């Protein structure tokens, strides 16, 4: 009897190992697909930026462009993580499967919140950021706005009020594995921006980026 019980435990253990391996593989494939989709969209976004930074209306809405039937307000670059990603204009679960999204706000009003899934190729490594790391948001006029990380916190997944609270110039967030909490990165503006008439900083960044180079 003990012999058969041992076989049962071994079988159950094997099932758990197989299920875990399947889940890891599934998540890896899903992350890779999300990365490829984002890369394709990034190319279309950067191609629609002007060759020189143009004037913008700080009191108006961020300009939006269409790429493959989706709307984008620009890009977000996190050099320390090797990320350069297109930002969709509106958050939706389906939108977040292919790129990060504006949750609310505007870079012009210093209250932009950007959300993304925890895919490795999206915002999965936000937890690895450090204070003073650089974050760059570029609008569709080619103008880049520079920020630095000032705080990293973990909030409950339903703590919407806390997510939107405070006078932060830029917030990035993603869910933890399992979705119970949100890794939340708060940033402040450094005051640095690209100048009108300059070649957009993001064009050079795109040329060097793995997200463009591998295409």
Language model feature labels by segment:
Residues 1-5:
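Short, Lys/Arg-rich N-terminal segment immediately upstream of the first membrane anchor
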Residues 6-215:
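Solvent-exposed, non-transmembrane regions of membrane-associated and secreted proteins
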């Amino acid at each position: 009897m003990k012999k058969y019980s041992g076989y049962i435990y071994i079988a159950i253990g094997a099932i758990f190992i197989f299920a875990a391996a399947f889940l890891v593989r599934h998540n890896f494939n899903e992350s890779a697909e999300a990365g490829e989709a984002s890369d394709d969209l990034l190319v279309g976004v950067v191609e629609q930026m002007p060759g020189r930074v143009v004037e913008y209306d700080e009191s108006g809405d961020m300009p939006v462009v269409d790429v493959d039937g989706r709307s984008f307000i620009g890009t977000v670059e996190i050099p320390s993580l090797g990320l350069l990603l297109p930002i969709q204009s509106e958050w939706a679960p389906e939108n977040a499967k292919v790129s990060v999204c504006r949750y609310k706000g505007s870079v012009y009003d210093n209250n932009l919140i950007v959300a993304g899934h925890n895919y490795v190729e999206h915002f999965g490594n936000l937890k690895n950021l450090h204070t003073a790391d650089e974050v760059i948001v570029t609008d569709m006029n080619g103008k880049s706005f520079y920020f630095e990380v000032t705080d990293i916190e973990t909030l409950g997944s339903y703590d919407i009020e806390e997510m939107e609270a405070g006078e932060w110039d830029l917030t990035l967030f993603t869910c933890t594995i399992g979705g119970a909490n949100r890794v939340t990165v708060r940033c402040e503006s450094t005051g640095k921006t690209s100048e009108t008439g300059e070649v957009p900083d993001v064009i050079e960044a795109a040329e060097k980026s793995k997200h463009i180079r591998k295409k």
